[in-house]
């Protein structure tokens, strides 16, 4: 695909997530691979209101997260997370959002270091079709130092698709294509919301 196609794919995801209010306080960042050798990708520019569309919404960076040539804006503060994804896998897209549900889930299960899901139909959206399929999402500490956070995050990048929760921060999901990454992020957010609502209902009943 061309650079422009990748740009439009990422812009469409940004618009859709903005409509869902998944970018509170300018949080969150999105990235899509534009080249594999050498690794290059588009990533959301830092500090911008992602509910607005401007010509400078994304910047083009190299395998270390540095700007390629002169550009307006600078890469998102968490670009190093996407650097780890694109350098360690052939994934084509990496998405990071802060939602209330993923933050609450990460705090509730943070001491366990993971959350597990099974017996949910939407797990199939994650590519798991077995009758007893189980999905495990690791939960890591929210290090203020981004290189430290990225190093901890990188320990859980083992496949071309995956997800990691950062405690009281957000989730990063990556997959081979933008479509797959968006689909999987939607599935995880569904599972988080379902889990929280189910727990609340059980407490109300019992």
UniProtKB/Swiss-Prot annotation:
Pathway field: Amino-acid biosynthesis; L-methionine biosynthesis via salvage pathway; L-methionine from S-methyl-5-thio-alpha-D-ribose 1-phosphate: step 2/6
Binding site for Zn(2+): 96, 98
Keyword Zinc: yes
GO BP: any one term: L-methionine salvage from methylthioadenosine
Comment on bound cofactor: Binds 1 zinc ion per subunit.
Gene Ontology molecular functions: methylthioribulose 1-phosphate dehydratase activity; zinc ion binding
Entry's EC annotation: 4.2.1.109
Pfam families for the chain: Aldolase_II (PF00596)
Keywords in alphabetical order: Amino-acid biosynthesis, Lyase, Metal-binding, Methionine biosynthesis, Zinc
GO cellular component, one term: cytoplasm
Catalytic activity line of the entry: 5-(methylsulfanyl)-D-ribulose 1-phosphate = 5-methylsulfanyl-2,3-dioxopentyl phosphate + H2O
Membership in a protein family: Belongs to the aldolase class II family. MtnB subfamily.
Role: Catalyzes the dehydration of methylthioribulose-1-phosphate (MTRu-1-P) into 2,3-diketo-5-methylthiopentyl-1-phosphate (DK-MTP-1-P).
HAMAP family in alphabetical order: Salvage_MtnB
Protein name: Methylthioribulose-1-phosphate dehydratase
Species this chain originates from: Exiguobacterium sibiricum (strain DSM 17290 / CCUG 55495 / CIP 109462 / JCM 13490 / 255-15)
């Amino acid at each position: 695909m061309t650079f422009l196609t990748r740009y439009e794919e990422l812009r469409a995801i940004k618009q859709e997530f903005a409509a869902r209010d998944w970018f509170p306080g300018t949080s969150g960042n999105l990235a899509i691979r534009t080249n594999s050798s050498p690794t290059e990708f588009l990533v959301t520019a830092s500090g911008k209101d992602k509910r607005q569309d401007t010509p400078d919404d994304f910047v083009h960076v190299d395998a270390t997260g540095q700007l390629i040539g002169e550009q307006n804006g600078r890469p998102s503060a968490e670009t190093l997370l996407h650097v780890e994804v694109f350098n360690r896998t052939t994934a084509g897209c990496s998405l990071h959002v802060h939602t209330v549900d993923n933050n609450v889930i990460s705090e509730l299960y943070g001491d366990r270091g993971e959350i597990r899901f099974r017996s949910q139909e939407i797990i199939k959206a994650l590519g798991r079709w077995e009758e007893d399929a189980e999905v495990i999402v690791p939960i890591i500490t929210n290090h203020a130092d981004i290189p430290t956070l990225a190093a901890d995050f990188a320990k859980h990048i083992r496949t071309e698709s995956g997800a990691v929760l950062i405690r009281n921060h957000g989730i990063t999901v990556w997959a081979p294509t933008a479509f797959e990454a968006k689909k999987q992020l939607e599935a995880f957010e569904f599972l988080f919301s379902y889990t929280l609502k189910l727990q609340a209902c059980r407490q109300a009943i019992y």
